[in-house]
Amino acid sequence: MIGIHCHNKPMTDYEPIPPPTNFHDQAEHSWTLPANWYTDSKVFEKEKKQIFYKNWWYVGTVRQLSKPGQIFTTTVVDQEVFVIRGEDNVLRAFYQENFRGTRGVKDIEDFNPSNFGLESVRVETLVGLVFVNLDANADALTDISESMVKDMRAYCPRLDDLVLSKSYELQTAANWKTLVDNNLESYHSAVAHPSLMGLLDYSTFEVWEDRFTTCHAMTNSNLDNPAYKLDSKDSVKRAIYSWLWPNTAFFIAPGPKNLGVFQMVPTGPESSLQRWEFYFENEQPTESEQAYLDWTINTLIPEDTALYENVQHGLRSQGYSQGRFVINRNRPEWSEHHVHQFQTLVRDAIMADC
């Protein structure tokens, strides 16, 4: 049984949430998180405070801040922050609420954040990408992602040199966890993604986890496949999909050097924004890279989006409250133990100060 229990504590600005029934630390014996955790506004408010305000959130690229004085603003759920490169060439981030002049910062002579009473936000970089964290006591991004990044670089060296080629966003009628759950299991691919099944050889499927990351890897099965055409000279022969807690995923697909970033942005208890960014060796995609983009945006993403929204609809059914995890560690392509890992992190975060 779950090892975290709520004790009598002073009331906070949100109601206590009861622990999920029959959720076990061992995946083989566990039920899933309850359906109302995917629909309840109280759970969503708790997630903002206990998950998104305390973990690493993708905000942009290092290239956007390549010169001293360059700045961009962003939002962590509902908290506005800005990131700036100082004259000392160091990246810094701050809450924006107490400073209305961020757009003109680069024009302010000898700009010093302390002169404006700005509260700092932690900022780190990862393979040329910028992340912020509102929690001053959180684990370092480099520490929690070290193993994942090592694996990503093994599949696609010199990731930091890739440049942004295409951005794509899509509003989705599903809780952010519905998106993560779907992306961490692969048994839906046989039915939902026929062209993906032609691109990748699922008999080569591998999955491995660290504390806050998961990686899936598969070999390309056919150069002339129904997804997009490949060349024998392409540098990436084996796909790797990596997930970083809580809501960022990275795709390295068969083909020329590439990186896809998929951020599952929560916008409400039953709504999310899919934020996709695609990186190649040059800003202008080649013909083969464009074919990959077209397939991903016009085929793969719509197929998954239909699943997200159908699952979310089912979670509102009065006939469903919880399910059981499908666990088969000898057949990882059919197993949900990595989904259980994610849901355990959610449970622990929500129950942390109940």
Which role does the model predict for each range below?
Residues 53-66, 101-107, 243-247:
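Short Pro/Gly-enriched beta-strand edge/turn motifs at strand-loop
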Residues 34-36, 61, 112, 140, ...:
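Short, solvent-exposed coil/turn linker segments
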Residues 6-95, 122-123:
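N-terminal pre-ligand scaffold of iron-sulfur
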Residues 3-5, 64-136, 142-150:
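Rieske [2Fe-2S] iron-sulfur-binding domain
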Residues 6-10, 84-90, 121-125, 129-354:
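C-terminal catalytic domain of Rieske-type non-heme iron oxygenases
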Residues 15-23, 102, 149-152, 235-236:
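Short, flexible segments with low predicted structural confidence
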Residues 29, 33, 107, 192, ...:
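Glycine-rich, flexible loop/turn motifs
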Residues 16-20, 34, 61, 116, ...:
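Alpha-helix initiation/capping motif
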